[in-house]
Amino acid sequence: EKQDPHQEVYELVSEAKLFDIEVKIPNISLFNKTFGAYKNNLYFGLKDIKSLTGVNGDKVIKAIQETCSEINKKPKQFNWMDVLIYLSPKINATAFKALCSVGFFSTKSIAVTRNKALYEYLIFKNLTKAELKWLTLNYPVRKWSNLYDAFKDLAPTKKEGGGTSKVDRKQVIENEMFFIKNPPYDLSDDPEWIVEQEKKFLGCPVSLSKVEASDTSHSNTTCKEILNGKHGKDICIVANVSRLQKY
């Protein structure tokens, strides 16, 4: 019987952790395309993300390469505004949201949570083509460090020195500025949500396990310690049972 590929991935990740090998999510800094080893760790690649395994993944890779040429930076040098202004318009919404959800942009240089990346992208993608063009042309000079500052300069009409075409659009941008500063929900990444998103897009949790997202205060032993021979009375472990198998 052919094994489910997602189950194979899950078992590989679980086994790696037992041998103290870190398994990490795909990220733009490393920009690896497929699953593999790098500096004693195992990394998922961009094309291991569900919905990006085929042609869609190739398109994302091409978009990142084009952005590198356009702004003369390596992927690991991108900041969040580079990603929003130059990269996001080159990628379809489904693919970009998948990248945000697995933490592809949540690196040290970009420094954005997964939820914040999703939230600001959904605001940014509603700009008109003319407004996006204005931001693209002005960003190299103004070098905004965040989306709020970019929208602050964009909001005035063209007659007022900004980038909007009319008063109605000015009001829309000002309204979005309010929600950038005052999001209606917490934009930090909840551990259970991270587990859920990685299972959805990578086939299994990678950054955290269901156990790590749970209360483990009553446990005194890990699964690894049991496998290494620990035994005795009053052993308590916290584990996630994914399947039962008879031997």
Q: How does the language model describe each region?
A:
Residues 1-247:
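Noncatalytic, beta-rich nucleic-acid-contacting surfaces in large DNA/RNA-processing enzymes
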